[in-house]
């Protein structure tokens, strides 16, 4: 299988005025001679005369670093998806902008009419990730003469989506891939899916357990699923012994060891002696003794451990695996029937493309290095202790699912500091109204601007603004004059070559719903425009979401940046048809599961896209509209149907009391009721194109196709196309 190496074409150099993400400095601002500002069309001239290519955008956003081998920039300036990684042929690449247009175009134009935000899943990438992980371990096992095999386990908590889990079971059945569950619902999900998977695939039961959980796990064992109950707490052992005897089931038991090895990275708190889960060495000895007394020591077959998520280096990995392998060998010495060593999670991904051991957004290794380190560490300890090599497992959920999912959202507007311009007469009038101190600051500011003294200009501009604010508070300046201060300061800033202020781009998204890890733990994800990458970005901006919360913004980006290079928005938004689309990548793990309903913004629409031989190289195999306003209201225990009836009754009263003809009253009522019904059926997000509105669509439905033209499944779905599902106006 292809190696997942990340490289950046060193031959591409940044155009004037830009630096790449890994650069630590930018060119010094140009000082205009005699303080005279450049012509207002200079920026446009620079943009058109300086050649800008997709390769420049790829380097600017470090796409070849974090995106390889699945994402690149094509010759049209769009993000291109390589569903089979390095084995993707040129005609198999998928233009992401074409996928977005297919999803969002109205149905009467051949689109699906889905509303943003939109999650696009690529199951082919999921398959490639599984195969690459298995291939890396297979190579390590073969090259090092390891006398057992590797079989992975997917922790469903990373992304419990039905199709994601089913795809993993299907794609992994040929190499005994299993599932891990940490709760009773996840266990039920895993049991059902593994009925179609490999019989050797493990069903690892982690998390806190009560009698019901353990009974369910033992039922799975009865159903011939290869189920292992992993002891996270010492007291769980008594329940396992008692319930297994009552059910007459011989359990497979694992235990989670609390290692001393700990890493100090972003997720280091999940590891070490003070980690949330696991048994100390003292507890492990007691568990072994109790199992021996119960005649069940042969049931203990698996050792599980977790060094921590996003393990930064192979040195730390080798240290932790070596410690765990010592515990494994000791369990063998004590008589346990050991067969498996489960490395847990920790296989990291490179969010910023730097391959750095010192970054919370990166890791200093690839899949092959990870696999080789694990195999070598286990083999070394077992050979020294003369212990049979165990089957190696890992729960590498983040590494499996992160790449396969892309979040697409629109920038709908931007906030700029367009200050008013003053004529010489207005300027003279403004200056006359300033107090002596403010007037002195203005004169000093003008003089410093003529001399081109940037730092001095900033000082006097700040002082002038502050003094004018104080005058405004005292009632000595009106609001127009206060606004004029910004215009003066902006003019001077341009005259001395100061950089343009960072803009705020308003995006049709809830960060709390779709990117919760950014808000909660400062996790950074690569965010880039998915089109216009053959054009030079003209501004820098931060992203502000739709929520009524000051935390609902993204002002930190990979590469240590506090703003993102962006393109100018047109009069109706971005470039193509007034749209400007951004993509958040590598967010396929955890983000959907952790997202909440802040401001009652629900989840995104979801599109499942497979590579095909069709003209555009892709087929939509599943489309799920995002939750409607009614759906999210219902999730908070409201009753949308009753709410609709209440509002419809109020509308009827309002129309009845109006001084209109009876015929007009009927039309007015029908219009109001229809508008209310539409509001309940629409998604909570902004509808930037009325043709993309999801009225008259069953939001709870799934739609499938085998080609690019989507078709409904069953008469029920087809009938639902033409009705406002629960809110029909009689």
From Swiss-Prot:
It holds the Pfam family Orn_Arg_deC_N. The modification N6-(pyridoxal phosphate)lysine is found at residue 157. It comes from the Eukaryota. The active site is at residue 548. One of its GO terms (molecular function) is arginine decarboxylase activity. Pathway: Alkaloid biosynthesis; nicotine biosynthesis; Amine and polyamine biosynthesis; agmatine biosynthesis; agmatine from L-arginine: step 1/1. It is an enzyme of class 4 (lyase). Its EC number is 4.1.1.19. The record marks 306 as: Stacks against the aromatic ring of pyridoxal phosphate and stabilizes reaction intermediates. Residues 1-37 form a transit peptide. Substrate binds at residues 460-461, 549. Pyridoxal 5'-phosphate binds at residues 309, 346, 395-398, 590. One of its GO terms (cellular component) is chloroplast. Disruption phenotype: Reduced alkaloids and nicotin levels associated with a lower putrescine production. Occasionally, an early senescence and a lower viability of the older leaves is observed. GO terms for biological process: alkaloid metabolic process; arginine catabolic process; nicotine biosynthetic process; spermidine biosynthetic process. This is Arginine decarboxylase 1B, chloroplastic. The gene is ADC1B.
